[in-house]
Curated annotation (Swiss-Prot):
It is found in: Cytoplasm. It comes from Pectobacterium atrosepticum (strain SCRI 1043 / ATCC BAA-672). Pfam families: Tautomerase. Its EC number is 5.3.2.-. Coiled coil: none annotated. Keywords: Cytoplasm, Isomerase. The gene is pptA. This is Tautomerase PptA.
């Protein structure tokens, strides 16, 4: 039951663009995890740049830097 939570700066993506990105992400999990399409979910959460550190970096990224599969190229 993989769930992908994409947190990002505002991009003004259309619903069609979100659907395409979600389908692409789901395809990767289906390929590498063997997941079925019905078991996958994808969320898009826009975070304002000035809120990124408080809402994403400090509570989610920073505490897990040692275990992240892909680390960011920035820090605060």
């Amino acid at each position: 039951m993989p769930h992908i939570d994409v947190k990002h700066f505002p991009r003004n993506l259309s619903e069609e663009e979100k659907k395409i990105v979600a389908e692409d992400l789901a395809a990767v999990l289906k390929k590498h995890f063997g997941s079925s399409n019905d078991s996958l979910s994808v969320a898009f959460n826009e975070i304002q740049p000035e809120r990124w550190k408080d809402e994403v970096y400090d509570p989610i990224i920073k505490p897990h830097l040692d275990t992240l599969a892909k680390k960011p190229g920035y820090s605060y």
